[in-house]
């Protein structure tokens, strides 16, 4: 529709070397693009859930709703929110977060930390990353296991000092076991990624290595956010909460649930999740374009490459034009990155869109996110449309803008009153308040 094409054309016009002409349409202007600045990535995901439910109530088919993101790792929080809300979804052209190879490897080490007799987990990682334990050696362990009626772990422990590489693997797992109950879950996972060599292995690989590293970082973020007390206790043994391994067991149980058979089956209508790259050639009635922060889209890497920004802008053009009727653009002012809370600012691509084709969603009442900080939540659904408005400035500042204070560090403007020299700002500095 007209507003969507106007936004796409306005963005691509900022490229010096443009290919082709602007797209035109005889259709009406249609809905304005809905822009929502969430305080956290968790709130951003919940907004997507709430809007998807509203669209479904209005008669929109789920398979005509798509969620786009710049990198695969961004899907984890969105998947989690859709799963917990019972909204069926599919990952187009990829795997669910907990089904990705690098995540399965990391979780296999975590499983061995609480149960070294898990043969499947041991077989997955005994020689991954490669540590010189060949197929013949593994076959010998399996033979010993079968003949003596013992687990592969017990066979590995019995291999003796002569089997130096197996002995080194045994020491690695023993070291992980000693951390259980002594360290937070997230720190144990960080240790696994480092001590197992997983992170270093993927750093040396070509192709999609950065995607895999980003996913491993996101696994650490998931562990930081995870609350064992919110687990599905039906999948865990009785009285497990007193076990030192409880946080790990609960996390593994949660991961198994989210990677199970809950993804929509063949022929079932479901929300489509995909990267912007994967969306090329596809169109949907409603599209959520998420993670629209500087350094994320455009990506930080592209900003350092010659021609990278223009390529990212072409991708933005693709993303916008995937929407036939309705487009949502969302960002999070706060995300977990490398295990730390990071503040973000709105993408330059959003600022290149003409204000007249945007509706800005106001942020409403205060609540708490799982990072332990106060945040803002959106107005009820029936008030959303009436609460969209153009951004106002206060003494040169605007709500949602990131600012830096000499004492308190970086913060986000979450409220403002009055204008000019009498303007007063409310700023969230994370833990500083």
Identify the function of each model-found stretch:
Residues 29-30, 268, 420-422:
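Short acidic/glycine-enriched loop/turn segments that link adjacent beta-strands
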């Amino acid at each position: 529709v007209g507003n969507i094409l106007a936004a796409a054309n306005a963005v691509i016009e900022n490229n010096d070397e443009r290919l082709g002409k602007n797209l035109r349409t005889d259709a009406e202007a249609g809905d304005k693009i809905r822009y929502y600045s969430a305080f956290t990535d968790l709130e951003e995901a919940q907004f997507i859930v709430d809007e998807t439910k509203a669209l479904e109530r209005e008669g929109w088919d789920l398979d005509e709703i798509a969620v786009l993101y710049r990198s695969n790792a961004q899907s984890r929080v969105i998947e989690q929110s859709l799963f917990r809300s019972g909204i069926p979804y599919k990952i187009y052209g990829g795997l669910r977060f907990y089904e990705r190879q690098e995540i399965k490897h990391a979780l296999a080490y975590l499983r061995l930390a609480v149960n070294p007799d898990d043969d499947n987990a041991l077989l997955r990682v005994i020689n991954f990353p490669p540590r010189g334990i060949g197929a013949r050696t593994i076959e010998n362990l399996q033979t010993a296991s079968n003949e003596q009626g013992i687990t592969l772990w017990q066979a590995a422990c019995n291999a003796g000092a002569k089997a130096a590489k197996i002995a080194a693997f045994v020491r690695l797992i023993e070291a992980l076991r000693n951390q259980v109950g002594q360290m937070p879950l997230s720190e144990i996972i960080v240790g696994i990624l480092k001590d197992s060599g997983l992170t270093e292995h993927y750093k040396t690989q070509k192709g999609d290595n950065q995607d895999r590293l980003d996913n491993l970082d996101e696994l650490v973020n998931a562990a930081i956010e995870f609350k064992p007390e919110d687990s599905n206790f039906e999948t865990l043994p009785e009285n497990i909460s007193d076990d030192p391994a409880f946080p790990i067991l609960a996390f593994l149980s949660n991961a198994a649930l989210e990677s199970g058979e809950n993804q929509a089956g063949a022929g079932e209508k479901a929300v489509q999740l995909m990267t912007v790259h994967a969306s090329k050639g596809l169109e949907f009635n409603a599209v959520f374009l998420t993670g629209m922060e500087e350094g994320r889209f455009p990506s930080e890497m592209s900003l350092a490459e010659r021609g990278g920004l223009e390529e990212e802008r072409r991708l933005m053009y693709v993303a916008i034009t995937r929407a036939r009727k309705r487009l949502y653009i969302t960002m999070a002012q706060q995300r977990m990155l490398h295990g730390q809370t990071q503040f973000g600012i709105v993408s330059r691509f959003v600022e290149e869109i003409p204000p007249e084709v945007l509706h800005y969603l106001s942020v409403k009442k205060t609540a708490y996110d799982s990072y332990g900080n106060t945040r803002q939540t959106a107005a009820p659904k029936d008030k959303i449309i009436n609460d969209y408005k153009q951004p106002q400035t206060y003494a040169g500042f605007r709500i949602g803008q990131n600012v830096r204070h000499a004492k308190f560090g970086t913060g986000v403007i979450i409220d403002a009153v009055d204008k000019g020299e009498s303007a007063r700002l409310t700023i969230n500095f994370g833990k500083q308040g």
